[in-house]
C-alpha cells in the first residue's frame, strides 16, 4: 500500500510518502516505511521555526487479543531558526541537528468499532528513546479514551491525555521537542496558546495533560444521521521549563465548556466547537 500526503495548517506544512505491507510474508505483522518533510513556523507565537526531513520504518503486530505492539525507528535532520523576539536561551538552540530515536507503542483496543465508536475503551502508551541525539530527549505519551452509551442513541466519551519530554542527560530539550496542548484537547483556546511564556512567546512545556468529557445530544437533529451535536468539558495544563524554571509562573489549569458539532463526510469527520 502506497500513500502520499500533503497536509497544510496555519503553522505547519507536511509532506510524506508512506509504504505499508499489512501482512508481511503472511506473518500477520505489518511493515511500514515513511519518508517525510515537515516545516513548523512558530515565529509569531513562539519565536522559532523548524524544518525537519527524515525517514522511519517499523512493524506492528497483535501480541494478544486486542493488544498491539509497535516497534520502529525514526531518523531526521532538523534546522531550527529563531527571530529577534526569541530570548537569549532560545537563540542558543538555533542550529542544525541529526537525531535517531527508537519507538515503542503499546495499544489495547476494546472498542466495539473504530468508526463512530459507542462502547469500550482505547488505551495507548508510546515512548521515544534517543539513540543519536545532542539533547538525549525521552518522550512519553499516554492516552486513554472510554466510550459509553448512557441512554438510547447517546454516546458519552471520557478521555485522558498525558505527555512528558525530558533529557536523560539533564540537558535542555530542543524548542521543537517542547510540548503544546493540541486544540482538540483544550477547545476554546488558541492551539499552543497555553502554558509557560518567555517574554511574549508561548514556549510549551516539559509536561502536558488534559481531561475531556463529551456527551452527545441525540434529541438535536435526530433525523440527520451524519451529524452529531454534543456538549463538552475540557480541562488541561502545560508546565515545566527546563532551561529557566523562573518562567514557569503560568502553571494553571485551564478549562472550557461548550457545544461541539461532528459532521461525518466521505473524506472523514469535520469538527467545530462553540
Where would I find each of the regions flagged by the language model?
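Gram-negative/organellar outer-membrane beta-barrel architecture
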Residues: 1-124, 137-138, 148-158, 182-206, ...
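Hydrophobic, well-ordered secondary-structure elements that form the walls
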Residues: 19, 144, 160, 213, ...
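Solvent-exposed residues in well-ordered beta-strands and their adjoining turns
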Residues: 20-22, 107-109, 128-130, 147, ...
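Short glycine-rich beta-strand segments
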Residues: 38, 126-132, 163-167, 232-238
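Outer-membrane beta-barrel and related beta-rich outer-membrane complex signature
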Residues: 45, 79-85, 168-178, 241-245
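Flexible, surface-exposed loop regions and adjacent strand-edge segments
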Residues: 49-53, 86-93, 143, 173-181, ...
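Extracytoplasmic gating/loop element in the C-terminal half of outer-membrane beta-barrel translocons
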Residues: 153-232, 240
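C-terminal beta-signal and terminal closure region of outer-membrane beta-barrel proteins
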Residues: 242-274
Amino acid at each position: 500500500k502506497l500513500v502520499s500526503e500533503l497536509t497544510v495548517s496555519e503553522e505547519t506544512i507536511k509532506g510524506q510518502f508512506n509504504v505499508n505491507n499489512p501482512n508481511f510474508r503472511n506473518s500477520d505483522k505489518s511493515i511500514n516505511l515513511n519518508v517525510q518533510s515537515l516545516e513548523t513556523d512558530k515565529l509569531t507565537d513562539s519565536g522559532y521555526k523548524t524544518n525537519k526531513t527524515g525517514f522511519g520504518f517499523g512493524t506492528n503486530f497483535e501480541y494478544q487479543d486486542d493488544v498491539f505492539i509497535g516497534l520502529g525507528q525514526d531518523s531526521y535532520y532538523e534546522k531550527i531558526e529563531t527571530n529577534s523576539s526569541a530570548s537569549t536561551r532560545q537563540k542558543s538552540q538555533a542550529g542544525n541537528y541529526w537525531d535517531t530515536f527508537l519507538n515503542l507503542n503499546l495499544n489495547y483496543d476494546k472498542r466495539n468499532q473504530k468508526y463512530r465508536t459507542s462502547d469500550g475503551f482505547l488505551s495507548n502508551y508510546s515512548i521515544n528513546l534517543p539513540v543519536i541525539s545532542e539533547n538525549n530527549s525521552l518522550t512519553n505519551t499516554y492516552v486513554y479514551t472510554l466510550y459509553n452509551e448512557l441512554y438510547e442513541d447517546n454516546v458519552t466519551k471520557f478521555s485522558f491525555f498525558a505527555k512528558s519530554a525530558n533529557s536523560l542527560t539533564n540537558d535542555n530539550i530542543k524548542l521543537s521537542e517542547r510540548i503544546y496542548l493540541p486544540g482538540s484537547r483544550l477547545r476554546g483556546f488558541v492551539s499552543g496558546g497555553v502554558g509557560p511564556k518567555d517574554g511574549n512567546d508561548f514556549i510549551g512545556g516539559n509536561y502536558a495533560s488534559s481531561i475531556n468529557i463529551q456527551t452527545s445530544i441525540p434529541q438535536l437533529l435526530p433525523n440527520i444521521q451524519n451529524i452529531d451535536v454534543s456538549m463538552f468539558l475540557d480541562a488541561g495544563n502545560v508546565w515545566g521549563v527546563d532551561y529557566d524554571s523562573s518562567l514557569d509562573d503560568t502553571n494553571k489549569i485551564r478549562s472550557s465548556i461548550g457545544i461541539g458539532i461532528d459532521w461525518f463526510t466521505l473524506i472523514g469527520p469535520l469538527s467545530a466547537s462553540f
